[in-house]
Amino acid sequence: MFYLLEYLPADWSVVPIENMVPLKAADILSRSSIFLSFCDIEGFGLPPLEAAISGAVVVGYTGQGAREYFKKPNLIAVQNGDFRNFTLKVADAIKAVDAGLLDTEGFQEGRALLVKKYGRENEQRQLEAFVKRVEMAF
């Protein structure tokens, strides 16, 4: 994290959400412009997805399962362990956010696609379809 400090503008701050209760973490995510993903060997990296759906640019590691949804401009992948490139991509993301990235049509379209594929409504539809298939099997 100390690598990042030289690139961090004075009006920006880093707020760790590790070990926070879910409601507090959700509150932080809803007000965040950038989320740093430190997913390592996770099956499906849920925190980066939650951050992207919340409207933040996500920069960092994909873990294993998050590769399928790490797409620019909303999510910017970094090779696991590449601290220098991680820092540079975060610095680029800060500049992009300051230049208005979060308000661009492309960013909003990317967010909408994530919500459509991974949001609660789709999850509910898939669960209902699963229950119907199970019921039909008996």
What are the language-model segments listed below?
Residues 27-32:
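Short alpha-helical donor nucleotide-sugar binding micro-motif in glycosyltransferases
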Residues 26, 49-53, 67-68:
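Short alpha-helical segment that forms part of, or immediately flanks, the ligand-binding pocket
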Residues 98-135:
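A charged, aromatic-enriched C-terminal amphipathic alpha-helix characteristic of glycosyltransferases
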Residues 1-23:
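Conserved catalytic-core segment of nucleotide-activated headgroup transferases in glycan assembly
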Residues 57-60:
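Short hydrophobic beta-strand element within catalytic cores of glycosyltransferases
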Residues 40:
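Aromatic "clamp/platform" in nucleotide-sugar-dependent glycosyltransferases that forms part
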